[in-house]
Amino acid sequence: NGTIDATGATITGFPEGGLKLISSVTNNSSVTSIDFTNCFSATYRVYYVVIASLPVASAQEIRAVIGNSDFSSTDTFQNVLAQWDVGENFAYRVSTGVAYIDLNNTGGAGEPPSIQFTLFNPFSSVERTQLLGQSSYYRTSGGTYSLGQLASMSDGTVSRTSLRLNCSSGNLGSSSYTARVSIYGLAES
C-alpha cells in the first residue's frame, strides 16, 4: 500500500518498525530506586531495557519490579539466574513467588553492573509477563567477573504500566559513576 516518490527520494506509507525510545535517565547519585511510571502501554507488546554502569551496595542485587503507576500493586515472578565467571565456575539461583526479578548476583560496589533485558507483555491482562536478559558484573562473593543469563515469568496476567529498579538492600547509584537507563518499545509494524 506504500508508494515511493523517486524524484524527491521520500518514502511514504510504509510501516516503521524497530526500537522507539520511550524514556532515558542518567543518574550519578545514591538513590533508593529509579522509577519509570506509565512506561508500558498497549502501543507495544515488547520492551527493551538497557542499564549501563549502575552501581549497587557491595554484595547486593539490582532488582526489577513491575507494577501499577504508584507500585502499590506489583507482580510476583518465578525467576532463574544462571551465572558463569572467569574462573570457569557455574552457579544458578531460583526464586518463586517473589515481587521482583534479580538482574545480577551479589554485585560489587566498585564495579557497576551493565544489564540488558527484553520484557514481553507487561501491559497484557491475557498473557503472562516474561523477561529474558543478560548481565555483566563483578561478583563480590568469589571476587570474579561474571556473566548472568536471566529468565522470568509472572505468576499472573495483570496489566502493568510501570518499572522500578531498586537494590536488594541499600541504594543504587554513586557519584563515582554516571549510570544511564533507557527503555525502548519494539514497533512491530
Give the location of each predicted region.
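Intrinsic low-complexity, repeat-rich intrinsically disordered segments enriched
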Residues: N1-G18
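Surface-exposed molecular-recognition determinants
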Residues: F14-S189
